[in-house]
Amino acid sequence: TSKIKLLKAAQGLFAAKGFRDVSVREIAAAARVNSALVGYYFGGKQALFNEVYRAQAMPLAGERMRQLEAVTRNRHKPSVEEILKAWLLPWLRLGSEQGESALHLRMTANISRERWMHARAALPAADRTHAAFVKALRRCLPHLTREEVIWRLHFLTGAFTFGVRVPGALTALSR
């Protein structure tokens, strides 16, 4: 259907260019449909983005929570390393996959260079997941404030998305 064509085209374009640098006309042209259908099906570019992002972010958030629950269930107090593996491994698996999962990873990396404000509406599941990881890390790192844990997780995520967005950059910078 036209709606599915728009979703697939938007996902590819958002992955390649981010949110700001993609127009509704460009999405419609890639989908080979009338641009008015973006408004008809989604209400606009922002809502289309939200649907595309949510469709991929929800499974990632769910897998992260499953990983965290497995770590906390098997051990009373998991290590920081185990918690961070639960945070990163689902994302790393996305990077090794082809198709929609890899597109989501690239889309996340590209929008990380933009302001995240347009993505906020699509992130309630990610917010809950982030909060659960912060809570788990705080139990392991009681000497750190909540803000310090949050910023450290942000920096970890930022370093990872930079590595995805600019392949080979971290290796080059390490020389």
Question: What residue ranges belong to the model's regions?
Answer:
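Transmembrane alpha-helical segments of integral membrane proteins
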Residues: 165-173
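All-alpha amphipathic helical-bundle segments outside canonical DNA-binding/catalytic cores
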Residues: 141-157
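Hydrophobic alpha-helical connector segments
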Residues: 65-104, 153
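Helix-turn-helix
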Residues: 5, 13-47, 51-55
